[in-house]
């Protein structure tokens, strides 16, 4: 049976560094929905993304449940294949001496570094997405020399290259 919700949270609470960052969250997100979360700083938007990516876990209580892609327990490798996230944490992990071509290529492998043995097929995928996003001119530029806008679009291309089911953009 197909579940139309890829994210289904009922009454979840999460703590981070001893502080409650999510309180009694009830939220369902369907596959067909585009969602924008708006709120003041400290309201839990980025923490929700950490829950979705399984970087933090909710407190388990009788009344609560959390399903991602219809599963209460999901393999992290499956999750990483199906969800791509672009946020400041990702931007800070990127080697500043990586060229944009290699940055985007690294998204296929879920790494943040230079990939030595790239196949022709993978190189073609990178060239294709760079052309589609109109950033082919950035191919040989180093990440550290890009403008903020160029960094963001390059990171979005990196996230999209693996064709995720879900794309999450945090402060992009």
Task: Give, region by region, the residue ranges found by the protein language model.
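Conserved structural motif at the start of ABC-family nucleotide-binding domains
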Residues: 7, 21-24, 139
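Hydrophobic anchor residue at the start of the ABC signature
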Residues: 48, 156
């Amino acid at each position: 049976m197909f579940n139309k919700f890829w994210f289904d949270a009922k009454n979840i609470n999460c703590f981070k560094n001893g502080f409650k960052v999510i309180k009694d969250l009830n939220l369902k997100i369907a596959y067909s929905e585009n969602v924008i979360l708006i709120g003041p700083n400290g309201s839990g938007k980025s923490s929700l993304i950490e829950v979705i990516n399984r970087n933090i876990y909710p407190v388990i209580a009788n009344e609560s449940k959390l399903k991602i892609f219809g599963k209460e327990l999901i393999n992290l490798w499956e999750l990483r294949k199906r969800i791509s996230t672009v946020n400041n944490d990702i931007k800070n992990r990127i080697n500043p001496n990586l060229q944009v071509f290699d940055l985007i290529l690294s998204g296929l492998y879920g790494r943040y570094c230079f990939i030595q043995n790239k196949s022709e097929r993978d190189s073609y995928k990178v060239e294709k997405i760079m052309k589609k996003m109109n950033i082919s001119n950035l191919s040989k530029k180093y990440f550290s020399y890009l403008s903020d806008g160029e960094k963001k679009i390059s990171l979005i291309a990196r996230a999209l290259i693996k064709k995720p089911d879900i794309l999450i953009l945090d402060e992009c």
